Amino acid sequence: MLVRTRVRRVAATATLVALAVGGLSMTRAQAQNKLAVSIAVPAYFNDDDSWDRAINTSVVTYIVGHPDTPANGKFVAAKELTAHLAQAKAKGKTTLIYVTAGYDKIGWEEVANRIDSAFDAYPNADGVFIDEINYDQCDKYKSLSAGSGSIKGVRDRHPGKQIVLNPGAPMLNCYQGLADGYLNLERADKDVQAWTNNVNLPGNTPYYAWMFKPDIRPQIWQMVHSVPTGDVDRAVDAAVARNASVLYVTPDVLPNPYDKLPDDSVWNKIIDRVQQYATGKVPLPAVKQLVIPANAATTTIKASADTAGTATTKKPTATTKKKTTKTTKKR
């Protein structure tokens, strides 16, 4: 989410290449996230207290730092953010740098350059969190992993770095294998039902079923804001039931739901519930599988080695998109 802020608009079969990349990606994700369920904190704030609480929470496994992007598109290391990220790494957290892809408003070569610049400014970061991507343009994002086209893959230029893609919406099956993490739901709590309705439309299930498979769980992220304070346990449970392994739940609201951590009393409730899943005290629920049509083998998009990651010719019938609002944040 570009929050500083916004509400974002909001592949069952992969190719041999994508499967190979996906296998490596899954290994990285599982190695980094040893807990069955954990928290990723979008640390789009400056105050030391919020950073300290996030860093010292055992079930927080990922922290996303949000640097300012200068007008020339080049990241310049901020002393304060560099120090916070170093403290997080010292506590065993996986640190990611926020980079926006700007939907179709930013050229893909510029996005690739921003990623390079982010790693130049923050070389010790473990990866990038790429926001504002399109749910249906796999051909663009394939270049991140496979290095096809005119842009060399990020994997080749930055080996060992993680990639998390964030459309904040359901992603087509052709994305499978292109990243280490997929944030497939990011919205207000009251709007989650619309997401559920979308992925369960009969015409959509072949495209979205991959996100609900048990073996993909370590790579599925979800973030839900505007949650009533008394319902944070329920919001955690619901995210886990949707196959999310990495999550963030907050009662904070737009225009910037990530400008602070929840108050201690609420944060502790969230931590306690996640901890119950992480330790196995509460077993992971059986994910409610999508209703796959009997002819799924023929209706599911299949990619060949020549078309891996290419946007599908037939798209889901009612993909939900979210509007974007932006605010300015000082660092």
Question: Would you name each region that the model predicts?
Answer:
Residues 1-31:
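Secretory targeting and sorting signals
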Residues 97, 304-308:
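Fibrous stalk/shaft segments of extracellular and virion attachment machinery
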Residues 32-294:
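Glycan-processing catalytic domains of CAZymes
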Residues 22-34, 307-313, 320, 328:
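C-terminal region of N-terminal signal peptides and the immediate post-cleavage residues
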Residues 295-296, 306:
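N-terminal propeptides/leader regions of secreted preproproteins
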